[in-house]
């Protein structure tokens, strides 16, 4: 802003001062009082038209500065890229609509899958039921035969066991009793025979003796009777006594009769066998007939109707998505273009100030060339041509000690900021910035993709909903058929089982009753009845009760129940795919793609294409930036080698030492005191700005030239150009010390003493101003009291 204000002030002063030409070595330049600046853009009066561009001409071209041009190139690249993106979006829209129609067809086919699958499922279910029923009947037939034989075996085993026990117990007991009775009878008969024989002998003898006695005694004669006495005849009684016999057969007749009447239970077994076999045989006959004739009819299962989905035809979500996507891209394009255009316009403002400042610097350097107060013409031209990088190099070089290191530091900055190097860097940065803008557009595009994915998810939900409805309807009808089949089998097949088990239980009850009846007939009224009934209950009754209990359990559990179909039998996989984390399992996805589905893939391909372009341009731009850093690295290596290497002497082929200032006696006699010296010391030696600042009683702090000091800078006119400003500060009474040539002392500047003559002071002052590009301060004892001249930075 100071430079711009100085330029405006110079325009005003231009009209208040008439131009005057000097015929001296400074011909063509005006002399102005201290502090007055000419219009630095005005050409000399005798050279109004110049072959070079003035400030106004330079300012007229600020709108085509490098940064504005780069931003315009970026705008053009973005316009081309966005035009390509819009074309890709249009193609993606067409592809997405086509894919949506395809997905709609796929969804209709998926929703119609129950129609096609149900026929096969119905046939498979019917075949399964037929095989299951036939297998169950065959198993039932074999089970009936096995149960029949087992029941008969158990009954035979129980009756035979019971028969054997009864025969063993009762027959054995009766035979023992009969044998004992017969033995007792024989013993008694023998004893009676002996007793009766003895008695009959004794009676016979008594009879004979008695009759003899009576015959010898004539009792009638005694009593006057002629009757002979009677005789005693006991033979008949003796015979009767001898005939006494005990018949054992009459004693064990009842036991023999009981022994002969023991039951063999053959009738019971035959009766039971006939009763038990009858239901079994009837059931087996029915099972055989059913096995041959049974076949489940699959036509009783329902068949769902075909479905036709129209979620794309009746829905404008995809159209709305792409319209919104184009609007979003247009909005992003407008925002980016507005920002870039504003940045391109605003870039002209600092470039205008840059031209003003560069023009002033060029005027200063031109003044130095005019006065020939320089030692390095190339350095002066470089500073005039590249004022910014040269000034940056000057500031950087002050951090190094030694004239060679400072020159190498400036050379490194000049090498790194050369026009070709900066051109490569600018291209790389512009490319990266373009990639950034395109990346913003890409993220905007990717941000909209979830909305389309949600719409596609709704499409899938439509398909799954249709599948669920068809599957549930079919499952209800199929389950009704299965339930009817269960009822029919339970009533017709297992009804026979229930009848059979009931008949067997009834038969066992009849068997028990017949056994009890036979035992009552045989042992009723005898002492063996209760033991026999106890044995019967132990051996037969408990086992029959167990068989009846088992048959009752069979009757209670003899039923079949085929599993029913789940309502989501046809939609389970499709519904599960919606919640699956892997995209390849989505039933709407193409197996050859890795995106969620074909519809979103149409938009994703646009993003991938733009991403590939951004990646390619980013690699190219990064390569350009890398090339620039390679250039910088080459310069840095050269500088490091130069700083670390030893300087060659003149005898070794090195360069001659550079003088501190020009030999004015040889090269330019009587020309070492240009206009600037008169401005510095005045025409009489005591009215210049140097004397003004060096007089005692001046300002407590004096501002030194070349800008950047503690306060406002003094102006030093150079043939109409604005003067540089002071940087360091010293008091007017301080004396400057002498600094040996070639020494570097930080960044304060070279200080010289008043041992030199005035002409040497003037020439040295101009020399150091001309060689100010060295950017270092020479000297050791920089400040001392006494009179001195203003310091100069080189």
Swiss-Prot record:
<feature type="region of interest" description="Disordered">
    <location>
        <begin position="9"/>
        <end position="30"/>
    </location>
</feature>
<keyword id="KW-0812">Transmembrane</keyword>
<dbReference type="GO" id="GO:0043332">
    <property type="term" value="C:mating projection tip"/>
</dbReference>
<feature type="transmembrane region" description="Helical">
    <location>
        <begin position="422"/>
        <end position="442"/>
    </location>
</feature>
<keyword id="KW-0472">Membrane</keyword>
<feature type="glycosylation site" description="N-linked (GlcNAc...) asparagine">
    <location>
        <position position="483"/>
    </location>
</feature>
<feature type="glycosylation site" description="N-linked (GlcNAc...) asparagine">
    <location>
        <position position="21"/>
    </location>
</feature>
<dbReference type="InterPro" id="IPR026777">
    <property type="entry name" value="PRM1"/>
</dbReference>
<feature type="topological domain" description="Extracellular">
    <location>
        <begin position="171"/>
        <end position="332"/>
    </location>
</feature>
<feature type="topological domain" description="Cytoplasmic">
    <location>
        <begin position="88"/>
        <end position="149"/>
    </location>
</feature>
<feature type="topological domain" description="Cytoplasmic">
    <location>
        <begin position="354"/>
        <end position="421"/>
    </location>
</feature>
<feature type="glycosylation site" description="N-linked (GlcNAc...) asparagine">
    <location>
        <position position="469"/>
    </location>
</feature>
<feature type="region of interest" description="Disordered">
    <location>
        <begin position="756"/>
        <end position="794"/>
    </location>
</feature>
<feature type="transmembrane region" description="Helical">
    <location>
        <begin position="67"/>
        <end position="87"/>
    </location>
</feature>
<keyword id="KW-1133">Transmembrane helix</keyword>
<feature type="glycosylation site" description="N-linked (GlcNAc...) asparagine">
    <location>
        <position position="505"/>
    </location>
</feature>
<dbReference type="GO" id="GO:0005886">
    <property type="term" value="C:plasma membrane"/>
</dbReference>
<comment type="similarity">
    <text>Belongs to the PRM1 family.</text>
</comment>
<feature type="glycosylation site" description="N-linked (GlcNAc...) asparagine">
    <location>
        <position position="520"/>
    </location>
</feature>
<keyword id="KW-0325">Glycoprotein</keyword>
<feature type="transmembrane region" description="Helical">
    <location>
        <begin position="333"/>
        <end position="353"/>
    </location>
</feature>
<feature type="transmembrane region" description="Helical">
    <location>
        <begin position="150"/>
        <end position="170"/>
    </location>
</feature>
<feature type="glycosylation site" description="N-linked (GlcNAc...) asparagine">
    <location>
        <position position="580"/>
    </location>
</feature>
<feature type="glycosylation site" description="N-linked (GlcNAc...) asparagine">
    <location>
        <position position="288"/>
    </location>
</feature>
<keyword id="KW-0184">Conjugation</keyword>
<feature type="topological domain" description="Cytoplasmic">
    <location>
        <begin position="644"/>
        <end position="794"/>
    </location>
</feature>
<feature type="glycosylation site" description="N-linked (GlcNAc...) asparagine">
    <location>
        <position position="189"/>
    </location>
</feature>
<feature type="topological domain" description="Extracellular">
    <location>
        <begin position="443"/>
        <end position="622"/>
    </location>
</feature>
<feature type="compositionally biased region" description="Basic and acidic residues">
    <location>
        <begin position="756"/>
        <end position="768"/>
    </location>
</feature>
<feature type="glycosylation site" description="N-linked (GlcNAc...) asparagine">
    <location>
        <position position="498"/>
    </location>
</feature>
<feature type="topological domain" description="Extracellular">
    <location>
        <begin position="1"/>
        <end position="66"/>
    </location>
</feature>
<comment type="function">
    <text>Involved in cell fusion during mating by stabilizing the plasma membrane fusion event.</text>
</comment>
<feature type="compositionally biased region" description="Polar residues">
    <location>
        <begin position="11"/>
        <end position="27"/>
    </location>
</feature>
<dbReference type="GO" id="GO:0032220">
    <property type="term" value="P:plasma membrane fusion involved in cytogamy"/>
</dbReference>
<feature type="glycosylation site" description="N-linked (GlcNAc...) asparagine">
    <location>
        <position position="270"/>
    </location>
</feature>
<protein>
    <recommendedName>
        <fullName>Plasma membrane fusion protein prm1</fullName>
    </recommendedName>
</protein>
<feature type="transmembrane region" description="Helical">
    <location>
        <begin position="623"/>
        <end position="643"/>
    </location>
</feature>
<keyword id="KW-1003">Cell membrane</keyword>
<feature type="glycosylation site" description="N-linked (GlcNAc...) asparagine">
    <location>
        <position position="259"/>
    </location>
</feature>
